[in-house]
Amino acid sequence: MKYVFIEKHQAEFSIKAMCRVLRVARSGWYTWCQRRTRISTRQQFRQHCDSVVLAAFTRSKQRYGAPRLTDELRAQGYPFNVKTVAASLRRQGLRAKASRKFSPVSYRAHGLPVSENLLEQDFYASGPNQKWAGDITYLRTDEGWLYLAVVIDLWSRAVIGWSMSPRMTAQLACDALQMALWRRKRPRNVIVHTDRGGQYCSADYQAQLKRHNLRGSMSAKGCCYDNACVESFFHSLKVECIHGEHFISREIMRATVFNYIECDYNRWRRHSWCGGLSPEQFENKNLA
């Protein structure tokens, strides 16, 4: 093309001379140059979108995929839809942290009495302190395992109680429940659902339930779906801040888990159950 030739040789010959020899109008040449350098409206939008999505993705510590990023950006006033955000992530080669397979904690037969399943996989609660759920998971460090027990309010999915220990004991479960009771100002008649682990069937834990007029409930044997909400939290914890990291000590793991629960998950991590709000935002909105 003549304009391409002129562009390639403009350092050697004058524009005027080349236009005359090639019989093209100089105005046509300059119009072509302007069109080449002008960014289309669509390109401008994509560049703006990519910049905004990258910033939000970075703030989420690479934890959010397209749906949660869309909620986050809409809350900031950007009218993007999920397809637009997903396309931006693909263009930039960005992917949220992915899960990996792990084996759940196995429990030995203990012969202790178990409670009836009062929940029956009905995780809906119309208000706070109606249904709580608890469980224990383990976290690997160079010093050995660190066990984490949590209590979640199924109304908002907030982690209201937690405890960590190098040993998986009944006291670990009791401490997590005690924190939940303290935070929620000791409500009564709450259904507290757990699995059938020895820590939850222990005399100490059962006495704590009875002392505070709480209603114990336990999953069916070997059915992880009966406590799916807590399993989902553990999955998020491990995918978003544990997997891919190396923890040389239990103390570093403690600090990481504390920060995730209290600073990230409860306060600002957007939850689909809460309509795209964080558990804390959901509670503040509905208790105002």
From Swiss-Prot:
Molecular-function annotations in GO: DNA binding
Name under which the protein is recorded: Transposase InsF for insertion sequence IS3A
Integrase catalytic domain boundaries: 124-287
Entry superkingdom: Bacteria
Biological role stated in the UniProt entry: Involved in the transposition of the insertion sequence IS3.
GO terms, biological process: DNA integration; DNA recombination; transposition
Similarity section: Belongs to the transposase IS3/IS150/IS904 family.
Keywords: DNA recombination, DNA-binding, Transposable element, Transposition
